[in-house]
């Protein structure tokens, strides 16, 4: 009889760990959200309703897309996924190796990254689909010395219809996400894990509050036992589960803040483009074309025609300082973060003006973030085991909580590489 494994979370870390363990363990995945459904309404139709004032708070997006969760803070908005596939269903499908911080503490994931590049549909063969505006942006950035490079994508380009829905769920499944790793695995949805019982140096029992549907008022309490328990509820969910189970976490939160810089541009049609088609690597931030739907619908400065604006994203590697408690973020950018962000804004202004935009027409988006992590960071002492001494022997963490420093880069591939290694350690 196979041993039992419980995996809490179905995002990049949880789904990959479950997939890797399924041959040797009887795996059950517990997902707090429900089955993912992509946003299906035409964005052009929703755009016509903006001036009515109906869209007055970013949290309203949860009504249209239940898998997208919003934590609104004074300085920024936290966006994360809750549903089968985790945040991978809402990410733009970027496949970037971002393990510099792990290398510094002696963790080499070359083997795992090589496997991922062989196993997954990772490609840069999407340039032929770029719009004239995307091509122009790329050329201007090349001429200005920003060294833009096509973004590796988890993508099947021949299935992509350039609908611009990448961050709201791909309607054609052209974009790969971790739901594809879960075929044949028992996934229990609507299962919010409240705590894990720990005794005699072992994780013994998982306590769950299960809802049959998103709108259900009835909750069932469940208790499950397993030989191995993996917490992969994301950098936002994992700290709460660990603390409720008596395991402390560090106030070491990073979130990779995002700020978009935009301007009017006739017939730009950026809403019908692949999001983040290429990237410029800067010092502690990146720049990439990105239609910021959160700002478009809820930031009044963005009340421009949907096909008549161009937007550049700054994604920042922020200082690891902050906390999450009961699904609520405490996070402020430091003076150094603001300094780097302002340099990014300056770069974007120069690029847009290089494309013919007038400086006075440039406006900023809403500061938001979607890559929380770092609250149970690995150190050199755990380079071989990838297992914190704060955890019982049979309890592992397998998400961005383990990352020792902010990335300022898309984290999905790196989290999956970590998950592969952790699953191997468990199996051996």
Question: Can you say where each PLM-predicted feature lies in the sequence?
Answer:
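Residue-level detector of alpha-helix initiation sites
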Residues: 11-12, 236, 402
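Glycine-rich loop(s) and the adjacent beta-strand/alpha-helix scaffold that form part
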Residues: 20, 27-29, 33-43, 196, ...
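Helical element adjacent to the flavin cofactor pocket in flavoenzyme catalytic cores
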Residues: 161-227
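Rossmann-like flavin
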Residues: 84-162
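FAD cofactor-binding and catalytic pocket of flavoenzymes
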Residues: 63-68, 72-73, 78, 85-87, ...
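Conserved acidic residues
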Residues: 3-4, 227, 393
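A glycine-rich dinucleotide-binding beta-alpha-beta segment and adjacent secondary-structure elements
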Residues: 158-169, 189, 194-195, 344-406, ...
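N-terminal glycine-rich phosphate/pyrophosphate-binding loop and immediately adjacent elements
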Residues: 1-101, 249-256, 260
């Amino acid at each position: 009889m196979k041993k039992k494994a419980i995996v809490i979370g179905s995002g990049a870390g949880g789904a990959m760990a479950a997939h890797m363990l399924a041959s040797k363990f009887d795996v059950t995945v517990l997902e707090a959200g429900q089955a993912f459904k992509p946003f299906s309404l035409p964005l052009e139709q929703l755009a016509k309703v903006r001036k009515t004032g109906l869209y007055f708070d970013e949290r309203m997006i949860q009504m249209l897309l239940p898998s997208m969760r919003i934590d609104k803070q004074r300085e920024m908005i936290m966006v994360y996924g809750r549903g089968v596939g985790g945040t991978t269903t809402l990410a733009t499908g970027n496949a970037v190796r971002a393990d510099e911080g792990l290398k510094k503490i002696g963790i080499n994931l070359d083997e795992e990254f090589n496997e991922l590049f062989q196993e997954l549909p990772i490609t840069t063969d999407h340039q032929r689909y770029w719009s004239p505006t995307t091509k122009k942006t790329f050329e201007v950035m090349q001429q200005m010395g920003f060294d833009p490079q096509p973004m590796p994508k988890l993508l099947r380009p021949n299935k992509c219809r350039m609908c611009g829905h990448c961050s709201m769920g791909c309607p054609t499944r052209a974009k790969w996400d971790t739901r594809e790793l879960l075929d044949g695995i028992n996934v229990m949805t609507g299962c919010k894990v409240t705590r894990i019982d720990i005794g005699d140096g072992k994780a013994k029992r998982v306590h769950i509050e299960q809802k049959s549907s998103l709108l259900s008022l009835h909750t069932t309490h469940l208790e499950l036992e397993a030989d191995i328990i993996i917490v992969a509820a994301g950098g936002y969910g994992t700290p709460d589960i660990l603390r409720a189970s008596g395991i402390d976490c560090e106030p070491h939160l990073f979130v990779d803040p995002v700020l978009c810089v935009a301007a009017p541009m006739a017939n730009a049609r950026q809403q019908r483009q692949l999001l983040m088609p290429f990237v410029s690597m800067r010092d502690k931030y990146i720049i990439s074309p990105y239609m910021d739907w959160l700002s478009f619908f809820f930031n009044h400065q963005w009340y421009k025609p949907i096909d008549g604006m161009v937007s550049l994203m700054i994604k920042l590697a922020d200082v690891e300082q902050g906390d999450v408690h009961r699904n609520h973020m405490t996070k402020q950018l430091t003076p150094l973060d603001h300094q780097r962000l302002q340099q990014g804004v300056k770069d974007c202004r120069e690029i847009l003006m290089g494309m013919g935009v007038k400086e006075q027409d440039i406006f900023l988006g809403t500061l938001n973030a979607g890559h929380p992590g770092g609250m149970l960071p690995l150190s050199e002492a755990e380079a071989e085991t990838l297992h914190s001494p704060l955890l019982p022997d049979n309890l592992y963490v397998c998400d961005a909580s383990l990352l020792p420093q902010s990335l300022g880069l898309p984290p999905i591939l790196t989290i999956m590489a970590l998950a592969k290694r952790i699953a191997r350690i468990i199996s051996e």
